[in-house]
Curated annotation (Swiss-Prot):
Pfam families: Dis3l2_C_term (PF17877), OB_Dis3 (PF17849), RNB (PF00773), Rrp44_CSD1 (PF17216). Changing N777A: 40% increased enzyme activity. GO terms for biological process: cell division; miRNA catabolic process; mitotic cell cycle; mitotic sister chromatid separation; negative regulation of cell population proliferation; nuclear-transcribed mRNA catabolic process; polyuridylation-dependent mRNA catabolic process; stem cell population maintenance. This is DIS3-like exonuclease 2. Belongs to the RNR ribonuclease family. DIS3L2 subfamily.
Length: 870
């Protein structure tokens, strides 16, 4: 019995129904520290499980004196009792052990912590020269089931990764550009990879994925480098987590308890969110009598309270979504969890748009702008793009130089500052790109019509125009408001064809319509000139010390009728993509310098901090052990190490993908900031681009930060008054843009993970070559090269006679002995080391959206090269 349309009639959030005395069952998976709290006698007066938060005044004083530390909380998605905040000294992250120490804070919250006494710090084994790379991504869903078959033995003494880090930085302007929703998110799912295990487990003991039994640690006599600072949360500065979760409803286990008569238990899909008591009166009417009818129904629940004396939070059902594992219910759940506003724009917002359509540019506005409508200007975008932010132009001058223009949609013209439209765009802060659709920052009339630089239509733009040498050296630079009329809408495929066939005339029927004022040859030559200059710009950027870490990205083909994935492929980043990227980067850097020179205290810029030093040094040590010396003294040095180490053969390219993935992990996120809030200009720098100043100017249709930058540039050029905004106010908007951008990236990752899981179910099993990324003593991690996903393979999931783990020098090695197919045959032996190439099979599990990676037996026929996709 399905209930996809069941709506819940609820009171408004924030009105709990008198449950201050409720103490629920013990939380699952608690740390030893948690258990001490819960094992206290509950007879008589109830004792608090969580500490009372400190007062604002005491917190403020403690932060000033340095006795307290603030940071963003990150919870390990696979071991939810482990949490971390960054250490202010850039060293190993500060460890927060257990739900009790976390004190009701949720993932992403800005928290204040107090360090525990040193004898309570986490011991990190000093003899472990074979560094376990801190490699668990900040995935926003629990690890998928990995298909292992648990035996009756328990896991012993295994200590998990010390650090969970944020997703990889990516500041190229090709990043999720223009609604290219299929293939612009790194990886399908961020899973754990590890190198040699630190534990001393018996190799016959299976790895139990969700268990962790820490052993008491005597930290006396250990050096400071052997200890990881540990802390407890004493205050939540900002509840950045939405307090919403998707999951399923269950009856409480104890039918005789008073709680059973009042509450159901909401079990979130994300194990980092606590279980939640939901009043039965908020549940579907027949839930108590027929709970199994709802066993596979997804609900959204919002936490409204979490008291000091209760293991579980109190919540309120918000909506019934539909069946778990189906794309639309799961998508709505993802959007809700991450606070994405996907509601229709209000009538008040829509009234801010031009009401008389078709809209034309007012004559007085034409007179205020440089008229470029006769120039050969065109867009290059994914074929499916509708929100065309940018256009390009290039013409050779008589002296052999080039005039190159980057023309960006003038969104700020249509979004008056302080209007209802401005406020909702500022709140949304970014468009969110899912595999199957876009949740726009602005109403579609703006995104797809008025602002979008559609061909053969007059459009308002903000332009940067340079006079460049053939080598890309800037001789002159001009900024200003313009009017353009794009002559054609090229796709990346069209531009790539022009680049690959420089002397051939491309038939008109293979190209989109071109305005009669311009010819195919004119557009073709402009693309070739842009490509030639872009190659020089790119070469010089890397000579000057830039770094690029491209990870495998997955793109999908969808069935037009059902919306289900028909196939997928690795997104190919080609010369046409690089062409656009180089000129977007050039424009962003130029605008950054212009607005900072004019408004040194009020410029909205984008900085990229250097990588986390502890993780990076551990990774370098690991590479040394593997015979791969790496220079990480600068971004450019790292880029050279990655590029010079590898050849063009299949094995070398796969190894480069693995190392690129590993070196992405210590990288921090790039951040928007207000220039007036940082005194040291060295902190303005962008590590990966290796430039002193950078901003975002080129995508105002989908990023609100770009709208702010457009307004600053307009003021810098005298088009409008100087900005009347305090630096701290601008910083708050920058922080909000950072938060929403991070949430958007998470949603993109989860959307891709959702579609890939559905594809495995519908089209699987899927076979691929994979490269081993990490070896533990009973499992190993692989990068599945055909699909760009990372999976852990457990030895006890395989048809093995035995397996053993050893170190050869410092390198970890698993020896697998396969059961023979024929009793008369000898067992097959297979050695697994880091960078081994293996064949794997991805197959769906019974649980919705879960799939396993299974190692193929050596000697079996390899997977066909025939694609199951497209």
């Amino acid at each position: 019995m399905n209930h996809p349309d069941y709506k819940l009639n609820l009171r408004s959030p924030g009105t709990p129904r008198g449950v201050s005395s409720v103490v629920g069952p013990s939380a699952v998976g608690a740390s030893p520290g948690d258990k001490k709290s819960k094992n206290k006698s509950m007879r008589g007066k109830k004792k608090s499980i969580f500490e009372t938060y400190m007062s604002k005044e005491d917190v403020s004083e403690g932060l000033k004196r340095g006795t307290l530390i603030q940071g963003v909380l990150r919870i390990n998605p696979k071991k939810f009792h482990e949490a971390f905040i960054p250490s202010p000294d850039g060293d190993r992250d500060i460890f927060i052990d257990g739900v009790v120490a976390r004190n009701r804070a949720l993932n992403g919250d800005l928290v204040v912590v107090k360090l525990l006494p040193e004898d309570q710090w986490k011991a990190v084994k000093p003899e472990s020269n074979d560094k376990e790379i801190e490699a668990t991504y900040e995935a926003d869903i629990p690890e998928e089931g990995c298909g292992h078959h648990p035996l009756q033995q328990s896991r012993k003494g295994w200590s998990g990764p010390d650090v969970i880090i944020e997703a990889q930085f990516d500041d190229s302007d090709s990043e999720d550009r223009h609604g290219n929703t299929s293939g612009l998110v790194d990886g399908v799912k961020k899973l754990s990879i590890s190198t040699p295990d630190r534990g001393k487990e018996d190799s016959s003991t299976p790895v139990m994925k969700d268990e962790n039994t820490p052993i008491p640690q005597d930290t006396r006599g250990l050096s400071e480098k052997s200890l990881q600072k540990s802390a407890k949360v004493v205050y939540i500065l900002e509840k950045k987590h939405s307090r919403a979760a998707t999951g399923i409803l269950k009856l409480l286990a104890d039918k005789n308890s008073d709680l059973f008569k009042k509450y159901a238990l909401f079990s979130p899909s994300d194990h980092r969110v606590p279980r939640i008591y939901v009043p039965l009166k908020d549940c579907p009417q027949d839930f108590m009598t027929r709970p199994k009818d709802f066993a596979n129904t997804l609900f959204i629940c919002r936490i409204i309270d979490w008291k000091e004396d209760c293991n579980f939070a109190l919540g309120q059902l918000a909506k019934s979504l539909g069946q778990a594992g189906e794309i639309e219910p799961e998508t709505e759940g993802i959007l809700t969890e991450y606070g994405v506003d996907f509601s229709d724009f209000s009538s008040e917002v829509l009234e801010c748009l031009p009401q008389s359509l078709p809209w034309t540019i007012p004559p007085d506005e034409v007179g205020k702008r440089r008229d470029l409508r006769k120039d050969c200007i065109f867009t290059i975008d994914p074929s499916t793009a509708r929100d065309l932010d940018d256009a390009l132009a290039c013409r050779r001058l008589t002296d052999g130089t080039f005039e190159v223009g980057v023309h960006i949609a003038d969104v700020s013209y249509f979004v008056p500052e302080g209007s209802s439209l401005d406020k909702v765009a500022a709140e949304r802060a970014t468009s969110v790109y899912l595999v199957q659709k876009v949740v726009p920052m602005l109403p579609r009339l703006l995104c797809e019509e008025l602002c979008s630089l559609n061909p053969m239509t007059d459009k308002l733009t903000f332009s940067v125009i340079w006079k460049l040498t053939p080598e890309g050296k800037i001789l002159e630079e001009w900024f200003g408001r313009t009017i353009i009329r794009s002559c054609t809408k090229l796709s990346y495929d069209h531009a790539q064809s022009m680049i690959e066939n420089p002397t051939e005339k491309i038939p008109e029927e293979e190209l989109p319509p071109i305005s009669p004022e311009h010819s195919v040859e004119e557009v073709h030559q402009a693309v070739l000139n842009l490509h030639s200059i872009a190659k020089q710009l790119r070469r010089q950027r890397f000579v000057d010390g830039a770094l690029r870490l491209d990870q495998l990205k997955l793109a999908f083909t969808l069935d037009h009728e059902t919306g289900l994935p028909q196939g997928c492929h690795i997104y190919e980043y080609r010369d046409s993509n690089k062409l656009v990227e180089e000129f977007m980067l050039l424009a962003n850097m130029a605008v950054a310098h212009k607005i900072f020179r004019t408004f040194p205290e009020q410029a909205l810029l984008r900085r990229h901090p250097p990588p986390q030093t502890k993780m990076l040094s551990d990774l370098v040590e690991f590479c040394d052990q593997m015979g791969l010396p790496m220079d990480v003294s600068s971004a450019g040095a790292l880029n050279k190490s990655l590029t010079k180490t590898f050849g063009d053969d299949k094995y070398s390219l796969a190894r480069k993908e693995v190392l690129t993935n590993m070196y992405s992990r210590p990288m921090q996120m790039a951040l928007y900031f207000c220039s007036g809030m940082l005194q040291d200009q060295e902190q303005f720098r962008h590590y990966a681009l290796n430039v002193p100043l950078y901003t975002h100017f080129t995508s105002p249709i989908r990023r609100f930060a770009d709208v702010i930058v457009h307004r600053l540039l307009a003021a810098a050029l005298g088009y409008s008054e100087q900005p009347d905004v305090e630096p701290d106010t601008l910083q708050k908007q920058a922080d909000h843009c950072n938060d929403r951008r991070m949430a958007s990236k998470r949603v993109q990752e989860l959307s891709i993970g959702l579609f890939f899981a559905v594809l495995v179910k519908e089209s699987g099993p899927l076979e691929s070559e994979a490269m081993v990324m990490g070896v533990l003593n009973q499992a190993f991690d692989v990068l599945v090269l055909r699909f760009g996903v990372q999976k852990r393979i457990y030895c006890n999931a395989l048809a093995l006679r035995s397996y053993s783990f050893q170190k050869v020098g410092k390198k970890p090695e698993l020896t697998l002995v396969w059961e023979p197919d024929d009793l008369e045959e000898e067992p097959t032996q297979q050695v697994i080391t880091i960078f081994s190439l293996v064949d794997v099979v991805l197959q769906a599990e019974a649980t919705a959206l879960k799939y396993s990676a299974i190692l193929k037996r050596p000697g079996l026929e390899k997977a066909s090269d025939e694609e199951p996709e497209d």
